[in-house]
Amino acid sequence: TIYMAGGEPFLIKENLKIIELIKKENPDLLLRINTNLSNLTPKIYNQLKTLKKVHWIVSAESTEARFNYIRWPGEYSVLQKNLKLIKQLPHKITINMTWNILCAFNILDFIDDMIQNGLHPNQFVMNYVSDPIFQSISNLSENLRKDLISKIEQKKKNINNKFYLYKVYEE
């Protein structure tokens, strides 16, 4: 297994050489890529689509303007476009979310949007941000926390409970 992370791994020019080496020397090797999908060029995409075992770990947790703010200089429209591309491949995709005060409520809309666009409910991993403390959702007022809990409870009623995060990172 090779794990590419960043910052943004597609900004690292040497990673394209590594992908070419994998393709040439061991195309059955598992390649894990942790990316925000902001720099998926046609050249990189064309190289990766020839590999059999790729696990895309996509960092995102909010929609539209909120995504653009949190993941600046990323753009939600670019994420959607690139996600649509990689969904066409026979690769595994996991959405790795950081649940923080900036997306406390919007993360629920994000999950809905991703599911409506073809992702499976089991493709999400939510990481609670506790540090730095000012980004933690524990800073929400009591009323906002109650409202958030209510929204989560409502969402849970609409989810088929057979879906749960089980072996999401395993191949």
Where are these regions (language model features)?
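Core AdoMet radical
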Residues: T1-K13, E25-P42, K49-Q80, K92-I101, ...
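Acidic-enriched, low-complexity/disordered segments with a strong bias for Aspartate over Glutamate
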Residues: D28, D109-D113, D131, D147
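C-terminal accessory regions of radical SAM enzymes
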Residues: L119-E171
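Catalytic cores of alpha/beta
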Residues: I101-N117
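Acidic (Asp/Glu)-rich catalytic clusters
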Residues: I22-K23, N46-K53, K87, I115-G118
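Short secondary-structure boundary/capping segments
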Residues: I18-I19, R71-E75, D109-M114, L140-S141
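Short, well-ordered amphipathic alpha-helices
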Residues: N15-I22, L79-K84, I111-I115
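Distinct, well-ordered alpha-helical segments
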Residues: E14-E20, P42-L48, N106-F110
